[in-house]
Each structure stands twice: as structure tokens, then as C-alpha cells.
Amino acid sequence: MATLACVGAAAMACALAVYLGDTTKSMSYLSYSGTILFGCSGLWYVWKGLLWPAYFSPLRHLKTVPKSGWLSAETLRLYTEPRGVPQCEWINKLDSVPQGLVRYRSILGFERLLVVSPEALADVLVNRSYEFQKPAFVVTQLEQILGRGVLLAEGNEHRAQRRVLLPAFAFRHVKSLYPVMWSVAEHLITSMTENIRVESSASPTEPVFSSDEPQAKHKHEMITVNIADLCSRATLDIIGIAGIGQEFGAIRNPNNALHQTYCEIFQPSKEATLLGVLRLLLPIWFVDWLPSRRNARVQRAVQTIRSLCRQIIQEERLPQAVDESHSEVASTGKNILTLAIASGAFTDEALVDQIMTFLAAGHETTATALTWAIYIMCLHPGIQEKLRNEVRSRLPKLPSTYNSAPQNLAKTIDTGMPYLNAVCQEVFRYFPPIPVTFREATKNTFILNTAVPAGTKIVLAPRVTNRQSTLWGSNAQEFDPDRWLCLKKQDASIDDSSAASPSFGGSGKRKSQYTDTHKEPSTRSNFATMTFLHGPRSCIGQSFAKAELAILLAALVGRFEFKLARGTPEKEIDVRVSRGATARPEKGLFVQIRVIEGW
């Protein structure tokens, strides 16, 4: 609204200049309107960034982060450190947060309201979920890449889309996809093993790995790989086959066009960071209009993906489509695309948006979690060895025959491998792929008993909640899978609308007693884990993502030993993290691997 007011003021200035005629000949229309525009913008920033938060905001009584706002050192951390890190440090330094809300100031002094307590989170995500929507700067930034799918839809549009798509992500259906995921994991392991042998024999061919280190002399020596790239290609193949019935072949071909296109979109750069900051200060349409190389590359990449999605939809509408390859998925009638088409609720362009959403969000987030899982395995060889022992004792050698017995695979992974499930839960807790997200109050409303004016920017920070010492005990900042093995369930009562797999737990508030390895009070609410959010806007694909991580991690650790490559930081805080859609390592993650015989 402020931007429109400034533009309107500038237009009025132009009209006034024309009306006054000769009396304003010394001043061009452009400079006159520019002066008015600049002045109005300046006044608005002074009001919104200085006067309002200091003297008029009804939120000024809340606990506020000291020295934040107006280019202060604390505020600049929000733009120079990994997302969620400053907020996490702020919260853990506070003695208490009575209202469950913490206020801080952004780069120009604008108010931000960080939701901290499980009770406040429940109010925002469940009780008043549609009163807090994604702000325009988030929607505009993501819409180009994700399309206007279920992730970005709001209100009745979101309810309708989620209702149509939910059967494709029901846990019962996801269990039927375990063999498909396992077959992709087998393909990944086989391909990696073969390429290790190729590189070990000093072949000049490098179809999978990139390395600037000396290559191994025999198969038991280490070679260096970019595991982040391999994770991304594997998850892209899984979402392709299990999600929309398409085989992309990204594992087989490292130069796969779709994979390379997504690499181009998610590639971090100083230019991308600068454009992101400008979107906070200037009209978003203006920033996207700027003739920058980054904008041009993203626009070309998005057009490529949209064209591919249209082609997939046309092929899916053909009568013979169901009888073609991957009938094991297509015959269920429950992959994302077949369900969406059968519903008749989407136009072809709306279907394109849905496919774009699940292709991008469905593979990038899980790939990020898997990359960090391998990183933590390198840092904790004891955890890696313990997990490998469980995998080898519970799952058959590769290649296996689970394609003919899907229920056995799902049952084994979900209920027969407690340490694998504990590691995966801890990965999602400790390394949420999306560490911070935003909401905006669409009207004057409340969070618990605190009045929140319309337009207030709300910060939901999974990294903060997931590592909060008041919820997780004194070892909240440590990676500790054993905390999940010490969880003692009593009579559980779930009052949230979303569910998840039995092995990973549901979502919602429940009456359970938890103890961690430090014998201190731990989380008593599912809102202490915010990786997939909760309520009507929780991640529709969380069961899919959890199964994907468990299967791929089991296969990788079962076959290979992992160590950090030379030059890869041994401290998590020293790893340069992308400030893009997900918190993945900015330059990939280079690790050393070798085959461990016997599985």
C-alpha cells in the first residue's frame, strides 16, 4: 500500500506539473515526480521504521532483541549469517519469553515478530492459520520457481487443492512407494560403486564424481565426491517416478537437462543475494524487471521447466499413458499428476503449477536434509558405524528383491530399524531444510492474548524451535539421535489435523512424557519440532520426505564409509550455507567415500 501511495503521489506530481505549465518550466516532469516519490518513500520509512515501532506499535511492550534495527550489528547478522542462526542465539540467551513472542527489528527498523512457544505456534498454525498468510515478497519470490501450486495457494483455493492432492501423500499410499524409492536407491548405490571402480583404475572418465584430489589406487581407498549433487539427482529421480510417473534419469546422467536447470535456479551468487535484499526495499515487480543476468537466467530456466511440465501433462492425457513404464505407480492411480487430472479441478496451466511445486520443493528439500545427514555422519563416525550395523543386520544385500514384497520393506524400515528412525528424526530436527519462513497478519488479530495489527510480519523459525533449550534440554545444540530412543510414550492425545508415519510420529499437541539423555525435561509438544510446520498448512509431503530420507540414507551408509574431504569445514558453523530457498551447503559438500565390503 505504501508503494502504491508513493507511485500515486508521483503521478499527481506529474499532473500538477502539466497543469501549472510555464511556472514549472525549469523543472522537468521526471525530476519533479522523482523528488515527490523519493520524499514520500522517505517519510514512509521514517514512520514505519522509526516512529511506529518506537512510539505507536502495540507490540512495543513485548520482549525485544537489544540493539536490533537500522543497520545495527545485530540486524546485519540476519543478512550475513545462515538463516535462523542469529534468531536461535537470541532466543537461547533470553531468560524467559512470557507471551511466547519476541520482537526484533529488520534492516530498516521494521518490526518482525518471532513466534517462540508451542502455544503461540499452535495459535498461528492451527487456530488462526488462515489469518496468517505468506507475505507478498515471499509469494512473488517463490511463485516464479514453484508456480502457484498448493504450497503458495491461500484460503479456499488452498483447501480445495489440498483436498484433491492429499490421497497421493497419505501414509498408506506412501508405504506402497517404498519399493520404488528403494529401486532408485539401489540404482544410486550401483552407479556410485561402479564409478568408484572406474576411478580407482585411473580411468579418465568422470561421469559421476568431481574431484581435485588424487584418486584412489584401489577400491578400498577413499575418493572424493560432491555428495550434495548426488543427493539432488537421486531425489529428483524419486519424485519423478513416484510423484508424476516420469523417469528423468538424473542418476545415470550427471548432465541431465532438468537437473542442470534446477542447479541454475538454485545456484547462489552475490547477485542473487543483492536482488533478495532489494526485494525487501523496493517494489518486487521493479526488482524482477531489472535487466540483470540473474533474472535472465532464472527466467530462461523457468520457461524450460514449464515447457517440460506441459509436455508431461499432454503425455499423461494420452489413453495409453497408464500402460507405459512405471505401471507399479501409475496403476494405483494415486501419483500426484493422475490424481490432479482425474479430479477435473485444474486447468492445464494450474497442473503445470502443481508439477513445478512438487518437482522443486519435493526434491530440493529432501536432498538438503540428506546432504546434511552425510555431513553429520562424517563428523560422528560412531553414529555412522552404529547405523551401518543396523542397516546390514535388517536389510538384505544389494541388489535385493523387495520390489516383490513392498509390505516387508515398509514394515522393516518403519518398525524394525529404531536407530535409523532416530537418526532421521534428529537430522530433520537439527537441520531443517527451510530454517526460517514468514507469515503476515491479514487482519487485526491475536496470538494468544497479544493483539497483532494487520500487516505485521510473523517469523516462523524451525531452526530456532528445533534447537530451543527450554524444549529440548541442555543438549539442544548437539546432534544426538539417542534422545529419540529415550522418548517414553504415555497416553498420547493428538489434537492437530495432520498426521504422519507411525515411525516418525504425528503432528500436533499431545500428552507425552519425554526424557533426554541428560535427564532434563524435554519437549512435551509436537510443536517443538517445526521442520514440516503443523496444522492445515503443514507440509503435505512430509511422509514422502521422511520415507525418502530413511531409504536413501540406509542405502548409502550401508554400502559406503564417509569422511570429510580435505578443505571441508569440520565445524558446522564454518560451512557456507546458501541463502536461497533451502539451507544447503553453498558450494556443495565434498566428502571422501569408499566401499565397505559385505553388503
From Swiss-Prot:
Cofactor requirements of the protein: heme
Membrane topology summary: Multi-pass membrane protein
Pathway assigned to this chain's UniProt record: Secondary metabolite biosynthesis
Any Pfam family the entry gives: p450
EC class name: oxidoreductase
Keyword entries, A-Z: Glycoprotein, Heme, Iron, Membrane, Metal-binding, Monooxygenase, Oxidoreductase, Transmembrane, Transmembrane helix
Transmembrane recorded as keyword: yes
InterPro entries (alphabetical): Cyt_P450, Cyt_P450_E_grp-I, Cyt_P450_sf, Cytochrome_P450_monoxygenase
GO cellular component: membrane
Subcellular location: Membrane
Note: Gene clusters encoding host-selective toxins (HSTs) are localized on conditionally dispensable chromosomes (CDCs), also called supernumerary chromosomes, where they are present in multiple copies. The CDCs are not essential for saprophytic growth but controls host-selective pathogenicity.
Name listed for the protein in its UniProt record: Cytochrome P450 monooxygenase ALT8
Classification lineage: Eukaryota, Fungi, Dikarya, Ascomycota, Pezizomycotina
